Amino acid sequence: MNLNLAGADAGTVEVSDATFGKEFNESLVHQVVTAYFAAGRQGTRAQKTRSEVRGGGKKPWRQKGTGRARAGTIRSPLWRSGGVTFAARPQDYTQKVNRKMYRAAMRSILSELVRQERLVVVDSFEVDAPKTKQLVAKLKDLDLEKALIVTEDIDEKLFLAARNIPYVDVVDVAAADPVSLVAFDKVLVTVSALRKFEEKLG
C-alpha cells in the first residue's frame, strides 16, 4: 500500500498492508478503549457498616419494659449516624486486555485512519525553536487544526511548542495509544514513526 506524503514533500511512501490495511474491528476497538478508561478509575469509594462505625457498643436501653421498640446499638442502619446496610467497598475496575488484542486494535485504528484520510504523513516534522507561533504556522500550511503529532522519538522543542495549543498534542510511537489516535480529527505522523509502528505492530 502507498500513502501520499503531505506538504512540500512530494511523492508517496510504501507501508505494510499487515499494519495499515486491516478491516475495522469496531467491537475490539470499543473493548480496548473501554478497558483504557476503566483502568483510570480510582475505585476508592468506601462506606462503613454497623460494625465499623465508631461507638454503639452499649445497648441504648433495656430490652423490655420501656414501651419503646427494642434496640441493641445506636449504630443500627435505621438510626441517624448509623452504619450503611450494604456499604460500598473499594473496587478494582481494570479489565484484562492481552497484547494480541491491543496490537490488533491499534492496527484496526491505523487502517481506519488511512481509509478516512485522517492520517497525514510527512517526511519529517520539527521546529527550529520551542515557539508556539512556529508550530501553528507549520500546522496551518498542512491545513491542520486539531491534530495528534506522532514522531519516532519525543522532540523536546516540538513538545514545548505544542503545550499551549488547544487540541494539539505531541507523542512518540511508544506513547501513542488507541484513545489518543481516535480522539483527534487528524493524526500527523512522520515516515520514521510509520516504520516504528510497522516494527511494533507487524
From Swiss-Prot:
Q: Where is this region: Disordered?
A: 44-67
| Highest taxon in the source lineage | Bacteria
- Give the matching InterPro entries: Ribosomal_uL4, Ribosomal_uL4-like, Ribosomal_uL4_dom_sf
- GO molecular function, a single term: structural constituent of ribosome
Keywords, ordered alphabetically: Ribonucleoprotein, Ribosomal protein, RNA-binding, rRNA-binding
Does the record carry Ribonucleoprotein as a key word? yes
**GO CC, alphabetical:** ribonucleoprotein complex; ribosome
Ranges of compositional bias, category Basic residues: 56-67
One biological process GO term for this chain?
Answer: translation
Q: How does it assemble?
A: Part of the 50S ribosomal subunit.
Q: What does this protein do?
A: One of the primary rRNA binding proteins, this protein initially binds near the 5'-end of the 23S rRNA. It is important during the early stages of 50S assembly. It makes multiple contacts with different domains of the 23S rRNA in the assembled 50S subunit and ribosome. Forms part of the polypeptide exit tunnel.
Family statement: Belongs to the universal ribosomal protein uL4 family.
Q: What is this protein called?
A: Large ribosomal subunit protein uL4
Tell me the gene name. rplD
